[in-house]
A protein has these predicted regions:
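Polytopic transmembrane helical bundles with strong interfacial aromatic enrichment
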Residues: 2-247
């Protein structure tokens, strides 16, 4: 009991002295986990849609099977990414109340747009997943387009918030330093946003292409006669090569 009391006292003392390192550690842990899922969630949708297009346009059954398989990965990464993203949204207010109190009116603008993109993506992910055998091929394909666009829009919105901290703009402060007027377009399209957003989107697509190529080559190493693995690897390479050049 004495040891427990002593340990509790030490913990309380450390937190009372400086809570900032603990807040940083907690947010770093959440971000480190979330950022792994973001490229997957953004890119799987695009890869799935391209495979789906090939299946509908050319009647490629291998592409259809690939799209159906990838759509499951897309749904899982979206769901888990949504959970970690929700945790992050709470952490901004709980861990950094002074920052949000002073700058939240401007900093929150990109997150408002991210929320709109998120709900759009959530709606159409559900329609796309459950529409495989319930919708005709072309209408089903078009339900995947909003998923891709919303995924890109959401990631760009979050990157815009980060870019705004690097190049603040689009706001007016009063004598106390509180933000009293905001120009949403200037906040989102700040000077640092274009380069950071392009970097993030290209990196997201490149990550998924590399993962797919690596997995399919591993399958070919195990079973060289599997034609579908060859097609999938070539398919991913075609998508990844331009991204590598852009990167």
């Amino acid at each position: 009991a004495t040891d427990a009391i002593a340990s509790s006292a030490v913990t309380t003392t450390v937190l009372a002295v400086n809570p900032v390192p603990w807040a940083r550690a907690q947010m770093a842990f959440t971000l480190a986990f979330h950022i792994i899922l973001v490229p997957l969630g953004v890119s799987w949708a695009f890869m799935t849609l391209i495979a789906n297009y090939r299946a509908v346009k050319h009647g490629d059954r291998d592409a259809l099977m690939l799209a159906q398989r990838w759509s499951k990965y897309m749904a899982v990464t979206f769901a888990v990414g949504a959970v970690t993203g929700t945790v992050l949204s709470f952490e901004f207010g709980l861990l950094w109340p002074r920052f949000m109190g002073q700058w939240g009116a401007a900093f929150g603008v990109p997150f408002a747009f991210e929320g709109l993109f998120f709900f759009t993506e959530a709606i159409f992910v559900a329609i796309y997943i459950f529409g495989w055998r319930r919708l005709r091929p072309w209408p089903h394909f078009w339900t995947g387009v909003p998923v891709v666009l919303a995924g890109i829009g959401g990631s760009v919105s979050v990157v815009a918030a980060n870019a705004w901290m690097n190049a603040p703009s689009g706001f007016t402060q009063n004598a106390e330093g509180t933000v009293v007027a905001v120009d949403p377009l200037r906040v989102i399209f700040n000077d640092a946003m274009p380069l950071q957003a392009a970097h993030m989107v290209v990196a997201a697509y490149l990550v998924v292409n590399v993962i797919v190529i690596g997995y399919e080559l591993f399958e070919l190493w195990r079973q060289p006669a599997v034609i579908a693995a060859w097609k999938n690897a070539v398919f991913a390479a075609h998508g990844g090569s331009p991204m590598m050049v852009l990167k």
